[in-house]
Regions:
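Short, Lys/Arg-enriched N-terminal segments with co-localized hydrophobic residues
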Residues: 1-17
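N-terminal ligand-binding/catalytic initiation module
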Residues: 6, 17-126
Length: 126
C-alpha cells in the first residue's frame, strides 16, 4: 500500500518528536506505512518503542538481527466467521480473530475475540 508523501512526512516527524533512535523511528514508520488505518496499533507500538528508546542504542545487535521488527509484526493473524442464533431464532454472523505475536518462548498468550466492535487494529493493540 502506497502512502502519500504528506502522510509519510507526518509519520516521520511524529516519530522524531517521540523517539530519539533513528532505528526505532524507521521501525515505527514501517509499521504505519504497512497498516495506515490501524491507529490503535500505532499507539501501542509507539508506546513500546518509547520504552525501548534508551536501551536500543546500547545494543546494536537488536537492529542487526531485526529484533524490534519481529516484535511489531504478528506471526499469525487468524480471521474466521462465528455464526450464532439469538433468543429470537435470528441467525447472526460475527467475525472472530486471534492474533499471535511470538512463540519464541512457548505457547501463544491470549484468546479468541468475537465481539462485533473489534478489528485487527484493536486486537493487535491488545
Amino acid at each position: 500500500m502506497k502512502v502519500s508523501a504528506f502522510i509519510q512526512s507526518h509519520i516521520t516527524e511524529g516519530a522524531q518528536d517521540m523517539l530519539k533512535s533513528e532505528y526505532l523511528q524507521h521501525v515505527y514508520t514501517q509499521v504505519v506505512t504497512r497498516d495506515p488505518d490501524q491507529r490503535e496499533f500505532h499507539q501501542a507500538v509507539l508506546e513500546v518503542l518509547e520504552s525501548l528508546d534508551l536501551i536500543v542504542d546500547q545494543h546494536p545487535e537488536y537492529e542487526k538481527h531485526g529484533i524490534i521488527e519481529t516484535f511489531v509484526e504478528p506471526e499469525r493473524m487468524i480471521s474466521f466467521r462465528v455464526p450464532w442464533v439469538d433468543d429470537n431464532g435470528q441467525v447472526h454472523v460475527n467475525r472472530g480473530y486471534r492474533i499471535q505475536f511470538s512463540s519464541a518462548i512457548g505457547p501463544y498468550k491470549g484468546g479468541l475475540r468475537f465481539h462485533p466492535t473489534v478489528n485487527l487494529s484493536i486486537l493487535k493493540f491488545l
